[in-house]
């Protein structure tokens, strides 16, 4: 846990806890959040220590339907995962290299070319973890651009005197302490060395290092992963509420009304969680959470639920329908494995007025989606309307 709190500087310049990178690594490479009972921090730490073992483990997810990649790297056509080593021949040549130039140059790549590009990114990401090049945990003293470097880059970045000695020795000492700790079950030395690295980061990287509160918030955000769980909670509440609302239309009972109101409250609580998750992303990233495809989808889902709760006075069907649509929108984000990574804001989007403009435009899709599902529900109710229940149907 302490190792996961250390800060790294990613390729885009964002400062984030190692815990965030390790979560992204597993999610992007293997479409999973853990491996064989190991959490993401343990997997990443193990990779940096035992790279020769991990290159043999089938971890890289290969999309189904593209057998050409499986054929090129030499794995079974039914295999879902490939080991890192399979992407290279005996001479160390990258097997996908002949196909990537055309894929990256294509103005409108086909699905096969997209799969090549996606797989290449997974291989590169895993290579950065295995080699330790992503482990940029050392801030360069007095660097005007606030550059942080990895252990591999330590000799070319102006570390002098005791700082140079420290950067050269601290990671080997830490890995040695981990090995000793695995035998003795005493991790005190390893924890002390992590605190030492943490102190080095605070001393030379304080200007760009996130506050302890932000680190806590980001690790909690990664741990609970509320947005990934919300679609299942939303759809469960929506379906039950929908059933009880329909039954209550035909058989008015006090317990049915109480049950419907209870699910209404549950949906409201889920919306509160949804809102808190968006606020957390805003706080962690430092900018409004609608700056990429994933955030836009999550925000559209939020606006759908917001308008559903705002117009719930006359009919509880509005709330149930809104929760159902919200669940479908959120599921779309995760079913397509859209990257949920928190990233730095692109300079072109760094505008107060543009932020408001995008918020209004994107939120407008919520009422459109809500109107669609309510129209469908209204048609269903009209279909079942007769002279006996016409009055009740009109009220709903």
Question: What residue spans do the PLM features occupy?
Answer:
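Generic detector of multi-pass transmembrane helix bundles and their immediately adjacent loops
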Residues: 303-396
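Soluble extramembrane regions of membrane proteins in the secretory/endomembrane system
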Residues: 1-220
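Core alpha-helical transmembrane segments of integral membrane proteins
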Residues: 210-336, 340-343
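Short, glycine- and charge-enriched coil/turn segments that flank and shape catalytic ligand pockets
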Residues: 184-186, 250-256, 385-395
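Conserved hydrophobic/aromatic pocket- or pore-lining residues that grip, position, or stack substrates
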Residues: 197, 292, 357
């Amino acid at each position: 846990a302490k190792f996961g709190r250390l800060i790294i500087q990613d390729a885009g310049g964002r400062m984030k806890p190692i815990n965030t990178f390790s979560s992204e690594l597993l999610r992007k490479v293997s479409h999973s959040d853990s491996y064989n009972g190991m959490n993401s921090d343990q997997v990443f730490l193990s990779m940096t220590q035992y790279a020769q073992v991990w290159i043999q483990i089938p971890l890289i997810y290969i999309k189904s339907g593209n057998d050409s990649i499986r054929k090129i790297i030499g794995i079974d056509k039914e295999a879902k995962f490939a080991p890192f080593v399979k992407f290279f021949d005996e001479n160390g040549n990258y097997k996908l290299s002949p196909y990537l130039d055309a894929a990256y140059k294509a103005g409108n790549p086909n699905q096969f070319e997209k799969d090549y590009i996606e797989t290449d990114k997974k291989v590169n990401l895993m290579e950065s973890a295995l080699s330790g090049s992503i482990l940029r945990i050392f801030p360069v003293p007095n660097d005007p651009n606030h550059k942080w470097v990895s252990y591999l880059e330590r000799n070319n970045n102006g570390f002098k005197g005791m700082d140079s000695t420290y950067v050269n020795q601290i990671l080997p000492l830490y890995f040695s302490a981990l090995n000793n700790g695995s035998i003795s079950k005493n991790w005190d030395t390893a924890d002390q060395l992590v605190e030492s690295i943490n102190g080095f980061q605070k001393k030379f990287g304080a200007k760009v290092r996130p506050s302890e509160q932000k680190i806590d918030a980001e690790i909690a955000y990664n741990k609970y992963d509320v947005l990934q769980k919300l679609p299942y909670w939303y759809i469960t509440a929506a379906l039950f509420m929908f059933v009880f609302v329909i039954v209550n239309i035909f058989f008015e009972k006090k317990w049915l009304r109480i049950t419907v109101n209870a699910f209404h409250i549950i949906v409201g609580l889920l919306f509160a969680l949804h809102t808190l998750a968006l606020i957390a992303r805003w706080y962690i990233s430092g900018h409004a959470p609608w700056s990429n495809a994933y955030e836009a989808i999550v925000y559209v889902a939020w606006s759908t639920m917001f308008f559903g709760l705002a117009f719930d006075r006359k009919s509880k069907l509005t709330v149930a329908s809104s929760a159902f649509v919200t669940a479908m929108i959120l599921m779309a984000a995760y079913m397509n494995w859209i990257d949920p990574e928190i990233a730095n804001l692109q300079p072109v989007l760094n505008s107060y007025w543009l932020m408001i403009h995008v918020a209004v435009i994107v939120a407008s899709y919520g009422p459109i989606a809500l109107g669609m599902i309510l129209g469908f529900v209204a048609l269903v109710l009209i279909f079942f309307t007769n002279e006996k229940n016409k009055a009740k149907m009109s009220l709903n």
